[in-house]
């Protein structure tokens, strides 16, 4: 459902943006459905979808669930944009940009430029860090679009 890898190499920046994107969408759903944070980490998305449909009598698909997570994240991002948050604020702390001297991640430093480029493409963000108009249309966030692009 969320295309999460089991064998992810944490020392590389390759595919990390997709991992973050999927983790955020999934985690947001857990928050929205009031599922214990610890359970979200161990339950498969398919299990949550099946339980949601059984409890509510709905017949949501995995695509519906993914879109709900995307919509929730985009709404929060747009709200933060309205409060002044932009691409300039999307940065990692200096400590995370310094290579460790030993351990499993020794020598690895995230390629922030690559990560942000891939992440912005996945999220449908423009160079300012705002959701693109077509993304807002696709997610039905017309009021947010009107406020961001007035």
Segments (PLM) and residue ranges:
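Extended C-terminal regions of large enzymes
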Residues: 1-150
């Amino acid at each position: 459902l969320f295309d999460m890898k089991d064998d992810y190499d944490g020392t590389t920046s390759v595919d990390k943006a997709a991992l973050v994107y999927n983790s955020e969408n999934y985690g947001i759903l857990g928050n929205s459905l009031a599922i214990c944070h610890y359970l979200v980490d161990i339950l498969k998305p398919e299990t949550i979808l099946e339980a949601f449909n059984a409890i509510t009598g709905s017949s949501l698909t995995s695509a519906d669930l993914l879109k709900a997570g995307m919509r929730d994240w985009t709404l929060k991002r747009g709200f933060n944009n309205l409060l002044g948050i932009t691409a300039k604020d999307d940065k990692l702390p200096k400590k995370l940009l310094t290579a460790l001297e030993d351990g499993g991640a020794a020598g690895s430093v995230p390629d922030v430029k690559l990560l942000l480029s891939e992440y912005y493409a996945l999220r449908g963000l423009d160079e300012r860090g705002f959701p693109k108009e077509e993304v807002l249309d696709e997610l039905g966030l017309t009021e947010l679009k009107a406020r961001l692009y007035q």
